[in-house]
Amino acid sequence: MYDEKKAERAVNFINNLKHTKGVWHGVPFDLLPWQDKIIRDIFGTVKDDGYRKYNTAYVEIPKKNGKSEIAAAIALYLTCADSEWGAEVYGCAADRQQASIVFDVAVDMVDQCPALKKRIKPIISQKRLVYMPFGSFYQVLSSEAFSKHGLNVHGVIFDELHAQPNRELFDVMTKGSGDARMQPLFFLITTAGTDRNSICYEVHQKADDILRGKKHDSTFYPVIYGIKDEDDWGLEENWYKANPSLGHTIPIKKVRDAFNSARENPAEENIFRQLRLNQWVKQSVRWMPMDIWDKCSFEVNPEKLKGRECYGGLDLSSTNDITAFVLVFPPTPTEKIDGAVALIMALDRSIRHESKESVYEKRGMRSFL
């Protein structure tokens, strides 16, 4: 069910705020179409009892599309205008500095809004904004404070979820912390990351499955802006598909320049794909484009490798598992160089905490660590 008045209330509140950065500083918000849709959908879609339908919103979008501004605006709305007495709203990120980015934007927005400025008491040393009429507050937390149990959460703004070192803060803030509230909102906003064993990729997969119709969760609102793995990363029409603010807050020339630099320097390609096009890449810096690497592939006959000079390389992961074990056979006057990947281990999240012995045994391998 859609409540136009509630949607309009949220949109009007945010549009009365002002931008805080660069040439946009002091300019009224005036939500862009993609932002307007997100706000209306989240705050205007309600259940039969009139409370919000969505308690989790996941927005994945490339850098410089205004993530911090929209996140700060939502934080202020939840704190001041959501008709919730004693609302506790938390800004979360991987570290205090990252979490402070959205908070600092919110502080600047308050400073530029006389109506909020006379009602909000900032406690900068604690990274806290107190909305005095309702006894509500917006407070910064980070992964360094993940043991903060016992919170009565009305709202969580999770900035750059992909940077979380583990899932502990996410679980503490989203699993049961808002049960005493009628319509808590967990607003997760991030750029794509590089770790496909992370909590962010787990949520990304859920969002993607819901968008594809493979899963259903009526309380989860997914938004993903980006290009697919099979899309041409050099096509400008794909840049617009991934960047809804392109041409508004992002000059197209900036993206063209970044693309040209990445095309000339393969080490920058994955950074461009991840940050500009919101692709989940395997690492932020790529030594060689994969299409060039793939051209070096040829069929290897193991029998012909017997007796040849050989060197082994073992790459250990940061935990207990093996990333890769590679055998390299130097070229001879009549033979090419050969490389054979003997072992690649990518442990599933579900077995990450098992002993390494049991993991290897289950996969028919012997542990030698």
Give each language-model segment a name:
Residues 88, 185, 324-326, 341:
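Conserved beta-strand and immediately adjacent loop positions that scaffold enzyme active sites
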Residues 17-22, 278-279, 312, 332-369:
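C-terminal nuclease/phosphodiesterase catalytic domains that cleave nucleic-acid phosphodiester bonds
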Residues 1-314:
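Phosphate/NTP-binding elements of NTP-utilizing enzymes
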Residues 47-51, 322, 354-355:
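Short, solvent-exposed secondary-structure capping/transition elements
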Residues 159-160, 315, 321, 338:
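Acidic side chains
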Residues 319-331:
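Metal-dependent catalytic core segments for phosphate chemistry
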Residues 207, 294, 320, 360-361:
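Residue-level signal for alpha-helical context at structural boundaries
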